Amino acid sequence: MKKHRKCKKIIAFVTVLFIAFVAVIGLHKTGIYRFDFLKDIYKKIDFQLSTNELNIPQDALSFSVYDIEQEEYLFYEGDSQLPTVASLAKLFAIDYALGKVDLEDIVEVNQEVLELVPAGSSLANLYAGEYTVKQIMEAMLVPSGNDAAYALAYHIAKNELGEGYTATEYIDYFMTELSEYLIEAGYSKTNLYNDPSGASMQADSHLDDINRVALKLLNYDFVKECIGKSEFSIQTPQGEFTWKNTNEFLDENSPYYNCLLYTSPSPRDVEES
């Protein structure tokens, strides 16, 4: 009887060793034992823990989270909806402008164009004076400055039309050209109408266009730099401007701090719309 039990234990032990051996061989062949695999598992667990309390607002028409590294959507809801584009219109304006001007070009902001900015707008609080194109774009991206969007539109239109037009005519010209660009560039589901800042309630877009333009702009270092900080400052002849980022995920005092980032130091970069 004792011999029988001992034999069973030996068989069980050998079986366990055999299973362990097969498992090790399998892990080796599939590469699962490698650090990269473990790192990938960690990233997935970390992302799930970071987003398990993520609640999509009930009135949100569409919502997406895109994994830049894996080139895939993690969330994609509201494909059939055309949400009001709002401040995301600035992304399309910047994309268009980058083909028209250089980042170090000087933009003359005047009081006439500042007075066109719709009441109640989010502002970079620009003063009349000189700024670089790069600074104007940063003012559009960080505090979502509608005044900066109007200044950029005015500058580009005036460069092309020359002197002799009103600020309204310059803005109208810019929007006509921008609308044509959107069609040519394949942003077929975006209509910005008559406002470069996104203040028009008629303007709408689609997740596909929004994510595409966001990913395109993230190829620019200055874009990644300015949107990756909770506060951002520029030095101009008018003085220093410091803006608070409208992205609450970057605000240490926000309950959403570090939950999702447009760009992050980790291997996983996530772009959220």
Regions found by a protein language model. Give the residues of each.
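Membrane-interface motif at the C-terminal end of an N-terminal transmembrane signal
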Residues: 23-36
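Short Pro/Gly-enriched beta-strand edge/turn motifs at strand-loop
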Residues: 45-48, 252-261
